[in-house]
């Protein structure tokens, strides 16, 4: 019996040992299974993350924020090593779900067609980074464009280019996604500067690069500006086309002038000088050296400093009358001959033209934004640019070609000036022709031109352009602008804009299509306007009084510059226009005191006479 009992005891012990070994093996198997599941989840998550984020050394990384799924995957993988088995299993499941969710949210792959390829991608912004000084370009897409490889390629195009060339190379590449961004060097003030370039994104399709976005320019050149001068704080809109021979005197102080316009014809400032006191100014910009007449520049220095000292803000008008033999690159190719117009279309149609315009604009902005030479807060590019034949000559062409030429030149001036003085305002100037629709007109309607101008700027990257207008009466000698005229109506399709219907202009500029990117109205100045005393000095004065009151009541006119301080003998001889506050001989006209007191507490006293002449109570 004892032997049997011992035998059974040993048998049970062996059985217990056998069951223990089986339990151990089962436990180890479960651990291995858990570990395998965990590793599989980690690998799947890692593969997904690596697939999404791994980039080759020469590619630009995507700036997309980390998604919730990607964040969860990373968190699960990092924390799993420190969790108990049950929590580890939960983490594995969570990781797997995150991976599945992320995979499910991958952008659709879309085939490119003739209908969708040109604007498949949208460049949302193209701006200079305040932190890095590089050009940051943000892009969105409805999905992943199907092409030869997995990349989007970024190209830069010159201002004058209208597409990619066969030999052109990309400046950056990135893995495709529905949202990507590039960051490239600006190379400001270097020979290969990209400040005036536009940027476009392409894919490689059938072995060649196919652009799939609309090109876009840099829209914030002010990010690299040295100066931020935006003008003085003025208490009225009163301005004047000043007489340079009277700047040093007391008349401008007596008149209480706040704003002044002054021309800068390029023929005056370009080239060398033999003056020992004011030698030639050598200026290098973007790898090219230019020369400015030191003696003439000194004259502008004195003029602008003197005006500023009198509390007067300046609007400088840059005009192209440069010699087409000495400086052909400044003038548009079809404007270099065939006209006796005083000024020509600027040239941004080739590299030499862009470099010349940008250098001139950069030089002027730099000289007249800091201390020591006077300051200019407003820059007007050209004169009455819709008046093609008379004031901004270019060989006759369609309005689209003409406006495109001006728009490109304007943007060059804009980027050059704003990259030096971020506070400056840049203006496009129009005359009073608005919507004539006259088939024999050698000029263009201002409405048509500004529509094309604004649309192009929006399409290629909107900027803070502004409007300068000349609402002369029609005809110009008609001082009584309030009298009815079939050409001057209160509707948007009026043939002419004068001070009688100036609200048509400001209402038009209040449309959504004309507003700045922040939703505000653009600056509007009346940089040239006036009334002749040829039909009587009191009529001239009454016209000014009524016009000024209308401008103030309108509320959207930032400044008005009356033409002019002193009658111009050539205008009287050629056109019969005596527009000045003073006669050629220097005596004050009736308008002098009206102008002087129009923005003071004595305004009503000096304008009361005008109500009977105008026939209106204003």
Label every PLM stretch briefly.
Residues 212-268:
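Boundary/entry segment of secreted carbohydrate-active catalytic domains
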Residues 258-436, 474-475, 567-572:
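Substrate-binding cleft and catalytic face of glycoside hydrolase catalytic domains
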Residues 133-146:
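Aromatic/hydrophobic beta-strand junction motif of beta-rich domains
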Residues 390, 536-550, 554-618:
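Aromatic-rich peripheral "rim/lid" segments of glycoside hydrolase catalytic domains that contact
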Residues 193-208:
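Short, aromatic- and glycine-rich surface loops/edge beta-strands on solvent-exposed regions
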Residues 360, 372-375, 402-538:
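Noncatalytic carbohydrate-binding groove/subsite architecture in carbohydrate-active enzymes
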Residues 1-78:
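Gram-positive cell-envelope targeting signals
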Residues 91-131:
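Short, compositionally biased P/S/T/A/G/V-rich stretches that sit at domain boundaries
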């Amino acid at each position: 019996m004892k032997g049997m009992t011992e035998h059974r005891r040993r048998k049970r012990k062996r059985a217990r040992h056998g069951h223990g070994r089986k339990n151990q093996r089962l436990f180890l198997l479960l651990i291995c299974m858990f570990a395998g599941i965990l590793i599989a989840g980690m690998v799947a998550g890692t593969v997904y993350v690596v697939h999404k984020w791994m980039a080759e050394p020469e590619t630009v990384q995507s700036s997309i924020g980390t998604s919730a799924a990607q964040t969860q995957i990373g968190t699960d993988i990092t924390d799993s090593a420190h969790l108990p088995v049950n929590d580890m299993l939960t983490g594995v499941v969570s990781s797997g779900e995150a991976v599945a969710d992320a995979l499910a949210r991958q952008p659709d792959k879309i085939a490119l067609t003739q209908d969708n390829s040109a604007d498949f991608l949208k460049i949302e912004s193209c701006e200079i980074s305040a932190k890095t000084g590089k050009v940051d370009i943000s892009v969105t897409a409805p999905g992943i464009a199907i092409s030869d490889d997995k990349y989007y390629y970024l190209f830069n195009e010159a201002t004058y280019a209208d597409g990619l060339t066969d030999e052109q190379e990309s400046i950056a590449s990135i893995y495709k996604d529905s949202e990507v961004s590039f960051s490239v060097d600006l190379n400001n003030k270097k020979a290969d500067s990209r400040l005036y370039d536009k940027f476009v994104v392409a894919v490689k399709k059938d072995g060649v690069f196919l652009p799939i976005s609309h090109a876009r320019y840099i829209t914030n050149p002010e990010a690299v500006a040295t100066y931020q001068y935006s003008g003085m704080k003025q208490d009225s809109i009163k301005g004047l086309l000043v007489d340079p021979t009277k700047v040093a005197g007391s008349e401008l102080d007596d008149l209480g002038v706040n704003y002044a316009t002054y021309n800068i014809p390029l023929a005056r400032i370009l080239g060398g000088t033999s003056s020992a006191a004011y030698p030639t100014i050598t200026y290098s910009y973007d790898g090219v050296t230019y020369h400015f007449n030191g003696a003439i520049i000194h004259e502008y220095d004195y003029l602008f400093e003197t005006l500023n000292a009198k509390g007067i803000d300046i609007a400088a008008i840059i005009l192209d009358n440069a010699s087409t033999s000495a400086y052909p690159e400044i003038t548009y190719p079809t404007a270099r001959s065939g006209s006796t117009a005083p000024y020509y279309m600027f040239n941004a149609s080739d590299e030499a033209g862009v470099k010349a315009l940008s250098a001139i604009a950069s030089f002027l902005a730099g000289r007249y934004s800091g201390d020591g030479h006077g300051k200019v807060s407003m820059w007007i590019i050209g004169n009455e640019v819709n008046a093609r034949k008379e004031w901004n000559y270019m060989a006759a062409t369609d309005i689209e070609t003409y406006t495109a030429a001006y728009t490109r030149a304007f943007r060059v001036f804009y980027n050059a000036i704003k990259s030096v003085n971020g506070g400056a305002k840049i203006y496009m100037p129009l005359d009073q022709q608005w919507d004539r629709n006259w088939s024999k007109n050698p000029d263009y309607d201002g409405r048509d031109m500004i529509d094309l101008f604004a649309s192009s700027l929006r399409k290629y990257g909107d900027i803070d352009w502004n409007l300068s207008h000349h609402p002369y009466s029609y005809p110009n000698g008609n001082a009584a602008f309030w009298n009815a005229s079939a050409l001057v109506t209160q509707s948007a399709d009026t043939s002419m804009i004068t001070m009688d219907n100036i609200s048509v202009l400001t209402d038009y500029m209040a449309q959504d299509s004309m507003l700045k990117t922040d939703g505000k109205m653009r600056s509007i100045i009346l940089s040239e306007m006036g009334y002749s005393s040829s039909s009587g000095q009191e009529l001239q004065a009454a016209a000014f009084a009524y016009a000024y009151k209308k401008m103030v009541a309108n509320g959207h006119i930032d400044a008005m510059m009356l033409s002019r301080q002193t009658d111009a003998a050539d205008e009287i001889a050629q056109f019969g226009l005596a527009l000045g506050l003073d006669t050629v001989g220097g005596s004050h006209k009736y308008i002098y005191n009206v102008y002087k007191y129009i923005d003071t507490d004595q305004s009503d006293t000096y304008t009361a006479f005008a109500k009977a002449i105008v026939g209106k109570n204003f």
